[in-house]
Amino acid sequence: MTTLQTQPLNTLWYTRCPVPTGLGISIQKGWLKEKFNEQQIEIKSIRESNSKDIRNSHFNHTLANSVRHGGSIPAIWAYASGQKTKVIGLSWADEVQLLLTRYDSNIKTVADLKGKRFGIPLNQDAIIDFSRAQAIRGLENALKTVNLTVSDLELVDCLRADILAAQQQQPEENDSSFYGNRNKINASAEIVALIKGDVDAIFLKGAHAAQIAHDFALHTIIDIGSHPDPILRSNNGTPRTLTVDEDFLTQYPEQAQSIVDAVLQAEQWAHAHADETHRYLAKECNSSEQWVHAAYGADAHLKLNTNFDEISIIALQDLSDFLYRWNFIPAEINVREWLAQDIFIQAQVA
């Protein structure tokens, strides 16, 4: 790889989604900071920044010298929109992906959904409405198991006008924050619609889904996240992408390798420390160990694996094709051209 480094790297920006990732464990353990401090490089959190533009880089990856580990839909959208990024690893941690209805509903199977109202979140101010995309993806995948299509149902946009009004009163610095006041008043509109009876079924995934299904005694029509076909399980979190901006990779390949090293170190540690890892994952997911266990299984610590498995690449392409077909991204992409496997291979050898 040709190195075009012109000046020393002073700061690495990082971000990860509130889901199980090796990067998240590495950050909590202090290993990412340690590796970069040894090189006199400061690390800073994108999600904890006071700047809205910097926080938004979690979704659009516009910030130079940054790494992101999380849901693939925003990463795909950024790349398809022209942002020059590279994937330096893929991780796959299967999670519950639930189609849910009320306990008193007569909908018991996926086939029963034909002709019914399916609630889909609509986030008008989102840079990329990944919640909407993953809901349609989960629904479409589930319907394939009974030879139905999304057109066999009525999609109902779910939008909370009262939440939007409250959000507009929030200070600008809290806009798009992950842990600020905006988050406290933000409830999933599709959940409210289901409880009120305005829709017949919805899609939720992860620890949040497990808890909501329990707390409201919802009936699980199907957990498509446990289907034997990995393509039908593929969604925003399966696989997740570890991405950096392309200029960073070109100019600072040793630092990019340090990121991969830190992620792999965290995952190897997790495999041998189940209880501690589950506690860390609960923090990462903004949840409890109970719901992490319900969503990801007792072997959640063993599901932290970053690599370039062929099935992950195929699933990522399938997800990208879905996003283009549903107009979530502006252009088709070839995911193999997006991958930077050489850095990952070098890290494994080292």
Model features per residue range: what roles?
Residues 38-46, 147-155, 285-297, 330-336:
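Short, surface-exposed acidic
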Residues 1-10, 350:
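Short, low-complexity disordered leader/linker segments with a strong preference
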Residues 33-37, 228-233, 303-311:
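Short, solvent-exposed loop/beta-turn-alpha elements that line the ligand-binding surface or hinge
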Residues 321-350:
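Conserved C-terminal helix/tail region of periplasmic/extracytoplasmic solute-binding proteins
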Residues 73, 164-280:
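Pocket-lining segment of extracytoplasmic ligand-binding domains
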Residues 250-328:
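Secondary-structure end/capping motifs
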Residues 7-151, 155-158:
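Short, glycine-/small- and polar/acidic-enriched structural segments
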